[in-house]
């Protein structure tokens, strides 16, 4: 093999080894959480620790789904059935789904219509709006928490899921609109003009020509909005004070309250929290890449 070939092979080995190491570091906490969630309580703190459970059990997942969980059991302290965070897990899961889907639907609807208007109609200030919107996204979301909380108090929306939906729309809409604006710019206007010449109305062109063409951008913006809404902790912690209306990110923190932490139950909750977004991302990742790559070259 020539020196150049040896150098190329060495580069590939270093690159793939580095990528493998980075992937392992990223995935190991999730693998350990999955392993812990499948272990019985007696094995979680066993020495030496094992990544692969010696005996697999689904009791932690069953406790979360059914809402039946017990506190720590030992020889001098029998397990007692009491009000535990596991009893509210399904409720929190549904709350998170409602808030995530609701805020995503509103953000995508507004950003798509706004992006279409900014790229297809001529009016004063349209060239500045996208840049001002992305500036709004660059501001840390924690700055908006107190003003939005005061607004929710005035509207009597505190401790409601609607307050979370509106809060998440306020932090996801700027980037979604900028992303859709960049994508709409890449769609040739000649396609719409041809449909208009054929007798289609503006709404028909938008529904049957623009939206299907802009689908990768819409999916990319939707994934972004869903991830932000699903993972947020700050707004849920400030806006909600009832245990029934909590979302998963806030509710899971209640597993740490008290003198004992049920690590098997906690890890099972963390694994279940990652499942919805992991499924969405894996199913739509090719659209995500196409959406974020849109606008690099204007059509």
Positions of PLM-derived features:
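N-terminal Sec/SRP start-transfer signal
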Residues: 1-4
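A structural signal for multi-pass alpha-helical bundles of membrane permease subunits
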Residues: 6-7, 12-299
């Amino acid at each position: 093999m020539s020196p150049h070939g040896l150098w190329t092979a060495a580069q590939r080995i270093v690159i793939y080894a580095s990528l493998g190491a980075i992937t392992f570091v990223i995935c190991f906490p999730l693998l350990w959480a999955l392993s812990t969630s499948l272990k019985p309580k007696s094995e979680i703190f066993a020495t030496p620790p094992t990544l692969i459970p010696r005996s697999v059990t689904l009791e932690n997942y069953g406790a979360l789904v059914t809402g039946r969980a017990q506190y720590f059991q030992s020889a001098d302290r029998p397990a007692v059935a009491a009000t535990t965070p596991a009893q509210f897990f399904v409720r929190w899961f549904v709350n998170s789904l409602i808030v995530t889907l609701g805020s995503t639907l509103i953000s995508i609807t507004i950003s798509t219509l706004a992006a279409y208007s900014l790229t297809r109609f001529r009016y004063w200030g349209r060239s500045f709006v996208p840049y001002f919107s992305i500036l709004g996204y660059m501001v840390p979301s924690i700055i908006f928490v107190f003003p939005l909380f005061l607004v929710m108090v005035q509207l009597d929306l505190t401790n409601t899921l609607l307050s979370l939906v509106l809060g998440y729309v306020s932090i996801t809409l700027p980037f979604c609109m900028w992303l859709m604006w960049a994508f709409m710019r890449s769609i040739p206007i000649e396609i719409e003009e041809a449909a208009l010449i054929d007798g289609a109305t503006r709404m028909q062109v938008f529904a049957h020509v623009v939206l299907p063409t802009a689908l990768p951008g819409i999916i990319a913006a939707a994934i972004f909005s869903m991830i932000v809404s699903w993972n947020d902790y700050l707004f849920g912690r400030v806006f909600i004070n009832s245990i029934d209306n909590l979302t998963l990110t806030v509710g899971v923190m209640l597993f740490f309250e008290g003198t004992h932490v049920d690590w098997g139950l906690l890890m099972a909750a963390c694994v279940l929290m990652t499942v919805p977004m992991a499924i969405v991302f894996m199913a739509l990742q090719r659209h995500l890449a196409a959406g974020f790559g849109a606008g690099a070259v204007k059509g």
